[in-house]
Amino acid sequence: MMGSKMASASRVVQVVKPHTPLIRFPDRRDNPKPNVSEALRSAGLPSHSSVISQHSKGSKSPDLLMYQGPPDTAEIIKTLPQKYRRKLVSQEEMEFIQRGGPE
């Protein structure tokens, strides 16, 4: 019993160093927030209204609306195996959803 008390009394207490993050992020308060439309134009993506206007004009590419995003994302989706792809929604199911359920 006496030996364990002596061992614990002779232990050295270590000082814990304060945490210093390895990743430095820029100060967000200094940077003004860009307008959403400006950010889309600078990224080269079509704005939401232009996609809608293309669809209303009868565009021949329904895949454009289905796979919105960068072109590489659309290519990845096309190469996915069938079990990982989104199930297509039938016209009847779309109408059911638009109605809000059974009549």
From Swiss-Prot:
UniProt gene name: KGD4
* Record's subcellular location: Mitochondrion
Q: How does it assemble?
A: Component of the 2-oxoglutarate dehydrogenase complex (OGDHC), composed of OGDH (2-oxoglutarate dehydrogenase; also called E1 subunit), DLST (dihydrolipoamide succinyltransferase; also called E2 subunit) and DLD (dihydrolipoamide dehydrogenase; also called E3 subunit), and the assembly factor KGD4. Within OGDHC complex, interacts (via N-terminus) with E3 subunit and (via C-terminus) with E2 subunit.
Q: What does this protein do?
A: Molecular adapter that is necessary to form a stable 2-oxoglutarate dehydrogenase enzyme complex (OGDHC). Enables the specific recruitment of E3 subunit to E2 subunit in the 2-oxoglutarate dehydrogenase complex (OGDHC).
Origin species, per record, is: Homo sapiens (Human)
Q: Which residues carry this modification: N6-succinyllysine?
A: K5
What positions are modified (N-acetylmethionine)? M1
Q: What's the protein here called?
A: Alpha-ketoglutarate dehydrogenase component 4
Single biological process term from Gene Ontology? 2-oxoglutarate metabolic process
Lineage, opening ranks: Eukaryota, Metazoa, Chordata, Craniata, Vertebrata
Q: Where is this region: Disordered?
A: 20-69
Give the Polar residues compositional bias ranges.
47-56
